[in-house]
Amino acid sequence: MPGVESGSVLAAVVTAAAAYFIGGIPFGIVVARLVGGRAPRSIGSGRPGGANTLRAIGPRWALVSGLLDAAKGCVAVLIPRFLGFGPEFEVLGALVAIVGHSRSPYIGFGGGRGVSVAWGTLVVIQPLVALAILPVFGGVILATRVSSLGSLLGSLFGGLMMIALVALQGLPPVYDVYAAGSVALIWIFHLDNIARLLRGTERRIDRRP
């Protein structure tokens, strides 16, 4: 029906636009400026992601920045949920927010890798998986001191767990798209890290910038 189709298009546009511009807010840069720290883009990989923010302003403020990034993911999913748009639009909001974080319109379409934002979307979509990821993510980083490896393995674990829950608990099948899409985006945004991991030259989080 034309009315239904136009309504769906409008819902998709509203969801995607809100998610992109919210996801693009560069909290790593904002927090660093507010506390008078070094610019995250001036060190390491040159991205305002979690590892560079940690190096630039220390663990306390990096945690604040990471939680704010996660909040962006939460909001991107909650907007379509509160508007009653359905799970497919929650997935759209989640994936677009991840893209917005990594391709931010506010800083010349650069950005981080999307890990914190993706975790925030997962907190709303499936909190159990969000909690289960944390020991994997943290354990890998503690063991290797390599943030990117924790992100890659944590996201893969979360994606597989999400797919398993869809099959076992009858969750909406579109969450399979969310699982595969979010993992794919995180891995794509980590391609340079993957290359360095394979060469054995990836940066450790405890290395001085």
What kind of feature is each model-predicted range?
Residues 38-50, 106-119, 146-154:
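Short, non-helical or kinked segments that cap or interrupt transmembrane helices
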Residues 131-133, 147-155, 170-182:
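Loop-to-transmembrane alpha-helix initiation sites
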Residues 54-57, 80-83, 96, 100, ...:
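Interfacial segments of multi-pass membrane proteins
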Residues 1-15, 71, 75-92, 123-130, ...:
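Helix-coil boundary and interhelical linker segments in multi-pass alpha-helical membrane proteins
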Residues 28-33, 98-110, 136-144, 191-199:
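C-terminal ends of transmembrane helices
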Residues 29-62, 110-111, 193-209:
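Cytosolic, membrane-interface loops and tails of multi-pass inner-membrane proteins
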